[in-house]
């Protein structure tokens, strides 16, 4: 274990990467474009499968962003987690409709598997194979041992629930129980004997599905009894990357709402003149800064090989979930009546935050986990 740097956050390389991502999303992923893709009049039928720009995803792959944290030996770039955090933050700020965050989560899980088959799958991700996790049971449990899928003779049977970006993904990393415990398995989205059923969710920039397996062929990534350990090892990175996306989305909401309160006139004064508006916006800013510090600290502790990575990551996700609810609700409220309409861009980011809020456990769930870690489980 190495000592964590006192000045954690972005180095020169990560700062350049963040600036590059900011310019890319500004040029190619404006709120107006996103609104045109995903927002429709609710009286008109809207497909529950998210509309997204596949050519833009290919550009992301060509920029090397899917490979950023993958080890060089597996065909990646081999940068630290903070590099992916820099990209995820800007992706959240753009509400980028893509399987990027889901693919990062799968990447960290595959890295934790540390097997030849997992390394090969990482190389495929580096070249653009979108991959997502299918690890949740019907009850929505995020525990690594809870799965409704079983494996017998190398074939999967059962249902994986709440699979993120399932309709955009080429592959699934599936947790399944066997005689000797939970293992992890790779399944192609086009494989026989699987059925991907899209679910409706609040977030307009993502899709979600449940996947049924009926003796589906799979490739073992982590042996029975090792799959849950790989998921546990990857969870700090997963929580950190989701929290980074929330930071970016929160910053967009704050910036947009602040600008609106400068131009919206009420009682012959800009809306931002009134303390009832000023003070909550300052609190949102402080909430975002606290979250950002915890996210950067979490990423840095993971990169430095600290022993308290889970503690840091759950602190970051707990704060990020609280920030998401507060920042997005204030953004809607301060936009007034227009904020509740389909014409307003704010609701797209609001809904992304509400989805992120519960993804891999909301603030209450994270604090319960933290209490168990710090105080100990109740008898």
What are these regions (language model features)?
Residues 94-103, 221:
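Short, flexible active-site-proximal loops enriched in glycine and acidic residues
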Residues 143-157:
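Cytochrome P450 C-terminal beta-domain/meander region
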Residues 1-94, 113-117, 128, 233-379:
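Alpha-helical interface subdomain recognition
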Residues 144-147, 162-164, 189-222:
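Flexible, small-/acidic-enriched active-site or ligand-binding loops
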Residues 78-87, 142-145, 187, 215-217, ...:
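Structural signature of FAD isoalloxazine-binding scaffolds in flavoprotein oxidoreductases
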Residues 127-138:
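A short, Trp-centered hydrophobic/proline-enriched beta-strand micro-motif
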Residues 159-194:
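A short core secondary-structure module
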Residues 110-115, 174-177, 186-189, 212-214, ...:
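Short beta-strand-to-turn element immediately C-terminal to the catalytic PLP-Schiff-base lysine
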């Amino acid at each position: 274990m190495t000592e964590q740097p006192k000045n954690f956050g972005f180095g020169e390389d990560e700062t350049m990467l963040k600036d590059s991502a900011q310019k890319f999303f500004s040029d190619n992923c404006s709120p107006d474009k996103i609104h045109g893709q995903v927002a429709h009049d609710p009286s008109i039928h809207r497909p529950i499968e998210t509309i997204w720009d596949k050519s833009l995803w290919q550009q992301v792959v060509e920029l090397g962003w899917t490979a950023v944290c993958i080890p060089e030996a597996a065909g990646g770039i081999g940068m630290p987690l903070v590099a992916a955090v820099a990209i995820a933050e800007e992706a959240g700020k753009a509400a980028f409709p893509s399987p990027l965050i889901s693919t990062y989560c799968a990447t960290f899980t595959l890295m934790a598997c540390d097997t030849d088959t997992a390394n090969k799958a990482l190389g495929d991700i580096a070249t653009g194979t979108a991959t997502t996790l299918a690890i949740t049971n019907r009850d929505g449990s995020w525990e690594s041992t809870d799965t409704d899928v079983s494996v017998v003779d190398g074939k999967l049977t059962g249902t994986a629930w709440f699979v993120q970006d399932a309709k955009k993904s080429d592959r699934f990393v599936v947790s399944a129980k066997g005689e000797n415990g939970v293992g992890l398995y790779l399944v192609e989205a086009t494989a026989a004997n699987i059925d991907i059923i899209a679910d409706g969710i609040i977030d307009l920039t993502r899709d979600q599905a449940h996947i049924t397996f009926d003796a589906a062929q799979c490739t073992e990534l982590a042996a029975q009894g090792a799959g849950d350990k790989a998921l546990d090892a990857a969870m700090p990175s997963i929580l950190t990357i989701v929290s980074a996306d929330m930071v970016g989305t929160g910053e967009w909401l704050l910036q947009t709402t602040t600008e609106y309160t400068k131009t919206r006139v009420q009682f012959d004064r800009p809306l931002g003149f009134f303390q009832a508006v000023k003070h909550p916006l300052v609190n949102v800013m402080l909430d975002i800064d606290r979250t950002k510090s915890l996210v950067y600290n979490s990423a840095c502790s993971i990169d430095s090989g600290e022993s308290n990575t889970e503690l840091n990551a759950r602190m970051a996700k707990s704060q990020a979930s609280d920030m998401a609810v507060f920042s997005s609700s204030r953004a809607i409220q301060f936009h007034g009546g227009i904020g509740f309409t389909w014409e307003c861009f704010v609701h797209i980011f609001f809904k992304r935050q509400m989805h992120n809020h519960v993804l891999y456990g909301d603030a209450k769930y994270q604090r319960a986990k933290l209490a168990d870690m710090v105080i100990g489980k109740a008898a």
